[in-house]
């Protein structure tokens, strides 16, 4: 279950598994964004209501285009995200019609990030697409900062764990509405 190489867990993710992996600030739980059963499993593990929505994290913007509707965004709005990516900034963007509500929750938008974390970059490049990302913790608990904390909260419940260093960020990503520019977190 414990892997040093994120690419070693690609098949696990593509087969519907939920994995934990280091991000810029905390350990994340992730799965295939195109697999509703995997997304539901992740939500159940975390005890998170589907209405809240989830984040997609990618290695580059092109990986996000199948999930968002960038046609309604201005050049300046897109550029505001590109100016901060890759990095610890999550942008709320309009979702593509037909996107699973398990990803977007009750919203007409989707939270997306292009990560600068080497492990996340490697994982998404190996997958060839983004991965669902939410902090590795039960709802109401503190996010896991080490593999040991992930195991303590999710032992026997996740399908893989990438061991590695967290990034240098002291807190989870800043969330910005790309249309209004408003900082939400």
Curated annotation (Swiss-Prot):
InterPro entries: DHBP_synth_RibB-like_a/b_dom, Sua5-like_dom, TC-AMP_synthase, TC-AMP_synthase_SUA5. One of its GO terms (biological process) is tRNA threonylcarbamoyladenosine modification. The keyword Transferase applies. It catalyses: L-threonine + hydrogencarbonate + ATP = L-threonylcarbamoyladenylate + diphosphate + H2O. Its EC number is 2.7.7.87. GO terms for cellular component: cytoplasm. One of its GO terms (molecular function) is L-threonylcarbamoyladenylate synthase. Keywords: ATP-binding, Cytoplasm, Nucleotide-binding, Nucleotidyltransferase, Transferase, tRNA processing. Pfam families: Sua5_yciO_yrdC. Residues 3-185 form the YrdC-like domain. It is an enzyme of class 2 (transferase). It is found in: Cytoplasm. The keyword Chaperone does not apply. Its main location: cytoplasm. It comes from the Bacteria. PANTHER family: SUA5, THREONYLCARBAMOYL-AMP SYNTHASE. NCBIfam families: L-threonylcarbamoyladenylate synthase (TIGR00057). Required for the formation of a threonylcarbamoyl group on adenosine at position 37 (t(6)A37) in tRNAs that read codons beginning with adenine. Catalyzes the conversion of L-threonine, HCO(3)(-)/CO(2) and ATP to give threonylcarbamoyl-AMP (TC-AMP) as the acyladenylate intermediate, with the release of diphosphate. Belongs to the SUA5 family. TsaC subfamily. HAMAP family: TsaC. This is Threonylcarbamoyl-AMP synthase. It comes from Shewanella loihica (strain ATCC BAA-1088 / PV-4). The lineage of its organism: Bacteria, Pseudomonadati, Pseudomonadota, Gammaproteobacteria, Alteromonadales.
């Amino acid at each position: 279950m414990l892997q040093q190489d994120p690419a070693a867990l690609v098949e696990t993710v593509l087969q519907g598994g939920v994995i934990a992996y280091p991000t810029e600030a905390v350990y994340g739980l992730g799965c295939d964004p195109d697999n509703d059963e995997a997304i539901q499993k992740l939500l159940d593990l975390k005890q998170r209501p589907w209405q809240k929505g989830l984040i997609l994290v990618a290695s580059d913007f092109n990986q996000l285009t199948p999930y968002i509707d960038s046609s309604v965004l201005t050049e300046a709005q897109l550029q505001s995200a590109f100016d901060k990516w890759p990095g610890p900034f999550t942008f709320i963007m309009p979702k593509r019609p037909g996107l699973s509500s398990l990803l977007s929750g009750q919203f007409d938008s989707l939270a997306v990030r292009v990560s600068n974390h080497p492990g996340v970059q490697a994982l998404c490049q190996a997958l060839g697409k983004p991965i669902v990302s939410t902090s590795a913790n039960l709802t109401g608990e503190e996010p896991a900062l080490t593999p040991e904390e992930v195991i303590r909260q999710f032992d026997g419940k996740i399908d893989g764990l990438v061991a590695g260093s967290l990034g240098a960020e002291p807190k989870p990503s800043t969330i910005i509405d790309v249309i209004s520019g408003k900082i939400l977190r």
